[in-house]
Amino acid sequence: MDDLPLELLQSLDHKKENHAFRSLKTFEGVDFFSNDYLGFAREELIHEKALEKLHTFPFNLNGSTGSRLLSGNHKAYTELEQTLCETFEVEAALVYNSGFSANMGWISAIIQKSDLVLYDALCHASIRDGLKMSPAKSYKFKHNDLSDLKNKYEQLKKHKNVYLITESVFSVDGDFAPLDELKVFCETHQIRMIVDCAHSAGIYPYNYKQYFLSIVTFGKSYGVHGATLLCSQNIKDYLVNHSRSLIYTTALDPFTIYKIQAAIELSRSVKAEKLRVKLSECISHFLKIAEDLNLMAYLLNSNSAIQGINCKDNAQAIDLQNYLQQHKFALAAIRYPTVAKGEERIRVVLHAFNTKDEIKRLLEAIHSYFQS
């Protein structure tokens, strides 16, 4: 079998030299790095309810057998999308295989050459890659900076259609977008606003129908897999006809769809509300202990479940990751080029199932590292 071209092999060597080489690993220890915010991924009820429904499915138990526009659009999809409309109080929902394919799919289909896109500088890679596939002009504005957004718009506003893309909770920094202020700005200038709610859906309530389009993923707080776009029926109809990442891929299997259905139903329960309260308490406890240990200078400015320990470079981020793993904590370093140079960090994700003792021991280990 032929090997990679020399220049590509050299690029791997360059990554190794700069502590940026990635490899697939398994991690053991207390979970402080998964996106399973509410613990739904370990919730047996979701699996049991999905399996019960699967046993009533008439055929194709193992796979969807095709694209949603061919044989893959089984009845479980119809039931789920109706549930999503009721849960999120929107006119239409369109399920995709992942959040990445959802963002790639709507951006490449809807955004046209004569359009303008303004997006937050910290938007997810799926949004950036979607914009690369679009012929439109796209410009980033400084993270959560309304002043810079307004300046960019004033310089570039001579376009028929303008779109603004942001996230509700940002996946790396963990901070919240000023959605109310952004919405006022968009309404004033007739800009279509899109919000990626991957890291907030299921935890924080939003008025989804006020946006042109919202993205909700099921692999975070819902603990399963897949994603949905929340939108108008006209947008859904257009995407069914033009979104290539929907049209030309095998649909999700019935069991996966039933697990999403069960997770959405669980998210509306009293049990889920108690888990959201527990998660909020874990966040408060984390910040209090960090302050007690004089660690606030090392922390990101975040009040969400996504926290972070700032490091000076890739090498220190890897070193701290290994140190914490030796202390039986499962965390991962976020390195350049995923983040800018000088912004490397250990990403700490808090969950409703983390105990106060686990949080305290984690922060004590971090304190010990920086004191050594």
Region locations from a protein language model:
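Active-site PLP attachment segment
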Residues: K209-Y238
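N-terminal "arm"/small-domain region of PLP-dependent enzymes with the aminotransferase-like
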Residues: D2-G63, I191, Y208
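Conserved PLP-anchoring active-site segment centered on the Schiff-base-forming lysine
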Residues: W106-A125, C282
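Conserved PLP-binding catalytic core of the aspartate aminotransferase-like
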Residues: F40, R276-L287, L293-K328, L350-A352
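PLP-dependent enzyme catalytic core of the Aspartate aminotransferase-like
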Residues: D2, R42-L51, A76, Q82, ...
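Conserved N-terminal alpha-helix of the aminotransferase class I/II PLP-enzyme fold
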Residues: H55-G99
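Active-site phosphate-binding strand-loop segment of PLP-dependent enzymes
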Residues: Y139-V195
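Structural motif of enzymes handling amino- and sulfur-group chemistry
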Residues: A251-K278, C282
